[in-house]
Amino acid sequence: MKANAFGKVAVMLGGTSAERDVSLKSGMAVLKGLVAKGIDAHAFDPAAHSLQELVEQKFDRVFIALHGRGGEDGSMQGALQILEMPYTGSDVLGCALGMDKVRCKQIWHSVGLPTANWRVVTQAEIEQVNVEAMLQELGGRVIVKPAREGSSIGMSIADNGRSLALALQHAAEFDDDLLVEQWVEGAEYTIGILEGKALPVIRLQTPHEFYDFEAKYQANDTQYHCPAGLSDDDEASLRTLAERAFAAIGGSGWGRIDVMRNNAGEWFLLEANTVPGMTEKSLVPMAAKVAGLQFNDLVERILAQTLER
């Protein structure tokens, strides 16, 4: 595909969410890749520029590299649709559902896809929660998550009443709705999605209790295994599960699905990511490379999806 077919491209990065720093790194990597392909691409931080400038400066399309609220939750996608500006990734509905961990799990559960047991606590309900009863109901060990944050921000593990109360208070600093999810003991996997098809599975190995913010972006002791060491049948079934999970929430274009496998060999869907990280430590580029797709070609493929909008 000729580079001039894309016209003038805005790489949207930064923003105002708690994931701003990660977004800046993702966006700059994407920008570098697009420019290397000869594409007329420019950085655009919506925290510093009005969206009207996209029209005034005659941009033709947008590569969204915003993570978290305001960029991955459907609001930016809706604004760009009003401007009739083609953009990468899922639409308003897919992004909104993917960002909301509670709604995402409700949909997966409703269509028969496997996900760990959970309960929802609102910020207003924290003081009334019977933490001991909730722990017992969910198997004695849980992970608490803000419903609408990414990069593992605000997450913590609890295995007694005091730690659950503290975990709820911590998560409430980031969201009014909190997900209390049964802890799944086992290995964590992630599956990139590109054009509706799963990329090679990656198995994550970290000495941390879980794949938290530090393990994702700061630690040097996190190991990534791709190929993941699964049998051919397990690799195929996990890829199919990821494709179904992404489609169930209305995801499109590209994304990532995170999964746990318990010690009995059962799969449990964790989360959907509709604008995954694109930093030097990010997982979708890693899987794409194993599939034979170099980073610059990957970002061009993702951008090419906007030509169909």
UniProtKB/Swiss-Prot annotation:
Which gene codes for it? ddl
Q: Binding positions for ATP?
A: 135-190
Does the record carry Protein transport as a key word? no
Q: What does the UniProt entry say about where the protein is found? A: Cytoplasm
- Output this protein's name: D-alanine--D-alanine ligase
Q: Tell me the residue numbers annotated for binding Mg(2+) 1.
A: D258, E271
For biological process, the GO terms are: cell wall organization; peptidoglycan biosynthetic process; regulation of cell shape
**GO CC annotations, alphabetized:** cytosol
State its Enzyme Commission number(s): 6.3.2.4
The record, for NCBIfam families, names: D_ala_D_alaTIGR, PRK01372.1
Under the heading SUPFAM superfamilies, the entry gives: Glutathione synthetase ATP-binding domain-like, PreATP-grasp domain
| Principal subcellular localisation of the protein | cytoplasm
**How does the cofactor bind to this protein, according to its record?**
Binds 2 magnesium or manganese ions per subunit.
* Summary of the function given for this chain in its UniProt record: Cell wall formation.
Which residues take part in binding Mg(2+) 2? E271, N273
What PROSITE patterns does this protein's entry cite? ATP_GRASP, DALA_DALA_LIGASE_1, DALA_DALA_LIGASE_2
What UniProt keywords are attached to this protein's entry?
ATP-binding, Cell shape, Cell wall biogenesis/degradation, Cytoplasm, Ligase, Magnesium, Manganese, Metal-binding, Nucleotide-binding, Peptidoglycan synthesis
Originating organism: Idiomarina loihiensis (strain ATCC BAA-735 / DSM 15497 / L2-TR)
Which family is annotated? Belongs to the D-alanine--D-alanine ligase family.
Q: Part of which pathway? A: Cell wall biogenesis; peptidoglycan biosynthesis
What domain of life does the native source organism fall in?
Bacteria
**Per the record, what are the reactions this protein catalyses?**
2 D-alanine + ATP = D-alanyl-D-alanine + ADP + phosphate + H(+)
Query: Which EC class does it fall in?
Result: ligase
